[in-house]
Design a protein with these regions (language model features):
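Active-site C-terminal subdomain of aminotransferase-like
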Residues: 52-158, 162-165
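Short amphipathic alpha-helices in soluble, non-transmembrane regions
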Residues: 182-190, 216-221
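Short amphipathic beta-strand starts and helix->beta connectors
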Residues: 151-159, 185-196
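Flexible inter-domain linker/hinge segments
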Residues: 211-229
Length: 229
């Protein structure tokens, strides 16, 4: 969730389905290399951002989104859907399979009347996935989690109150306002960005974080890392 907790939503989804409602999930793509994907626990639609797949932050954008759904909704999807087919020589080929909701097909019933696209960013993210492959993506995700786990263990051993014991790459630490202000001042002076609440700080450790970065974060909290990746 927005505080870094990893929760089991399968029960919630099951109850929702009993009321004939649909479930849409916003999910971090990289986390899904380690976590059960939304489709496995009953979500109808999954959406999110592909920035973590090799696309620079770019001051917050632009980034390509991803959108996935069950077969039940495939004819309601805006845009052009590419499918796998076979060419006249019997070779595997990609072709345009569905464009049901495109403007030139349905016009007044079209759902694709948004005239912007992030094709370049989508291609960058796709090629990042192709370059690393499933095992490589899983290794990248595991490394980010291992970094978070090392920091979590060190902070917990030092007596800090962490509110998320199940996490992927983001930790939330509750602190008194005075201590929070002190850490924020030192972090900003060191060029380290955290997310601050009134009485808590959140730390996200992504695939770019190094052992040195982790050490510098430990210095801010006056802890020594118990584990190194």
């Amino acid at each position: 969730d927005c505080q870094g907790k990893v929760e089991d939503y399968s029960g919630f989804v099951g109850r929702t389905k009993s009321y004939a409602a649909y479930v849409c999930v916003a999910a971090d793509m990289l986390s899904l290399a380690l976590l059960a994907p939304p489709g496995e626990w009953g979500a109808d639609v999954a959406v999110g951002n592909t920035q973590r797949f090799g696309v620079p932050m770019g001051y917050g954008g632009p980034h390509a989104a991803y959108f996935a759904c069950t077969e039940d909704f495939k004819r309601q999807i805006p845009g052009r859907i590419i499918g796998v087919s076979v060419d006249k020589h019997g070779n595997r080929a990609l072709r345009m399979a569905l464009q049901t909701r495109e403007q030139h097909i349905r016009r007044e019933k079209a759902t694709s009347n948004i005239c912007t696209a992030q094709a370049l960013l989508a291609n960058m993210a796709a090629m990042y996935a192709v370059y690393h492959g499933p095992d490589g993506i899983r290794d990248i995700a595991q490394r980010a989690h291992d970094m978070a786990a090392a920091l979590h263990e060190s902070l917990k051993n030092a007596g800090y109150k962490l509110t998320n014991n199940h996490y992927f790459d983001t930790l939330r630490i509750e602190l008194p306002e005075s201590q929070l202000a002190d850490i924020r001042e030192k972090a900003e002076a060191a060029g380290i960005n955290f997310f601050y609440e009134k009485n808590a700080v959140q730390i996200a450790l992504d695939e770019t974080v190094t052992d040195q970065d982790l050490h510098e974060i430990g210095v801010l909290f006056n802890v020594k890392l118990t584990t190194s990746t």
